[in-house]
Amino acid sequence: MKKDLDEIDTDIVTLSSFILQEQRRYNQKHKNEEGKPCIIQEASGELSLLLNSLQFSFKFIANTIRKAELVNLIGLSGIVNSTGDEQKKLDKICNDIFITAMKSNGCCKLIVSEEEEDLIVVDSNGSYAVTCDPIDGSSNIDAGVSVGTIFGIYKLRPGSQGDISDVLRPGKEMVAAGYTMYGASAHLLLTTGHRVNGFTLDTDIGEFILTHRNMKMPLQHSIYSINEGYTAFWDEKIARFIAHLKESTPDKKPYSARYIGSMVADMHRTILYGGLFAYPCSKGNNGKLRLLYECFPMAFLVEQAGGIAVNDKGDRILDLVPKTLHGKSSIWLGSKHEVEEYINFIK
């Protein structure tokens, strides 16, 4: 019995306390130029409050998804979203949860959501803009596949009252980004430009607990994640590269394919184990994934974890500038070795 008690870790760190600790560390560092680097870039506490509001929405969404089938939230809502996809019932309710949480915290001035055609301007004095895909992978949710919420945060430009120019900016100007994956457990990955930390929701106490500190992607792993059903529509170089990954030689084993069809689930595995995730352009389009609330946040996380994120041409994702709220891009992101191999292959 004593042995069992000794194995229980009671030195837990919640997301709320982690955010406050990092803010205090920032304040202390800038008073005496000592102390460890921290993740919270703004010492006013406004970003801390915003992150706490986000985690509330993630808890609410996680609870809603767990009960979805029992309370008839599975299926279509009959509404078409900003990108032309027919909304699931869960898309709508989780979008409402997210927007309500952002409007009520007093720190958020602008909201961009996949489910909303236009920019939402909040009646507040907030200094931040939040971009979000409330439920990524919702087309698979009826089958019980893991889905997630992806988010990014910009600080408004100096002197701005809040307009579209505050979000039509390069991804490298985001101050925070992350996602929450809703599966067997709810897993939250967060960065504010200094490391990536992972949290797991303990449903008994209702708190996200720090479980993965300072996450780093493996430099190489022989797994790729891509929808090969579109092979016939890819550029020839891209098709040849994927074929190259599957080649077997005396010196190289073929790569294994792992594709779930939910970006958050596929990327969670890729960040933990390494490898490559890609969603290239099909002929005649500019890609499927949206820059502001899919490509940028994931690229921000991947780079902070030691990986690389580029588009079909090999251009850095975080250097791109979206032309519209729902502008799209191709994307290749993952371990340093795999993405560099792709870049060298297409040159």
Curated annotation (Swiss-Prot):
Gene Ontology molecular function terms on file: fructose 1,6-bisphosphate 1-phosphatase activity; metal ion binding
A Gene Ontology biological process term: fructose metabolic process
Transmembrane segments: none
Activity regulation, per record: Subject to complex allosteric regulation. The enzyme can assume an active R-state, or an inactive T-state. Intermediate conformations may exist. AMP acts as allosteric inhibitor. AMP binding affects the turnover of bound substrate and not the affinity for substrate.
Chain sites annotated for binding Mg(2+) 3: 133, 136, 294
Gene3D superfamilies, per the entry: 3.40.190.80, Fructose-1,6-Bisphosphatase, subunit A, domain 1 (3.30.540.10)
Sites where the protein binds AMP: 19-23, 44-48, 127-128, 155
Domain of life of the organism encoding this protein: Eukaryota
Cofactor note: Binds 3 Mg(2+) ions per subunit.
InterPro entries assigned to the protein according to its UniProt record, in alphabetical order: FBPase_C_dom, FBPase_class-1, FBPase_N, FBPtase, Fructose_bisphosphatase_AS
GO CC aspect terms: cytoplasm; cytosol; nucleus
Pathway stated in the Swiss-Prot or TrEMBL entry: Carbohydrate biosynthesis; gluconeogenesis
Catalytic activity, EC: 3.1.3.11
Co-factor(s): Mg(2+)
Signal peptide: none
Annotated binding of substrate, by residue: 136-139, 227-230, 258-263, 279, 288-290
Catalytic activity: beta-D-fructose 1,6-bisphosphate + H2O = beta-D-fructose 6-phosphate + phosphate
Residues binding Mg(2+) 2: 114, 133, 135
Keywords in alphabetical order: Allosteric enzyme, Carbohydrate metabolism, Hydrolase, Magnesium, Metal-binding
Residues annotated to bind Mg(2+) 1: 85, 114
Family statement drawn from the similarity comment of this UniProt entry: Belongs to the FBPase class 1 family.
PANTHER family the record matches: FRUCTOSE-1,6-BISPHOSPHATASE-RELATED (PTHR11556), FRUCTOSE-BISPHOSPHATASE (PTHR11556:SF1)
Record note on quaternary structure: Homotetramer.
Protein name per the record: Fructose-1,6-bisphosphatase
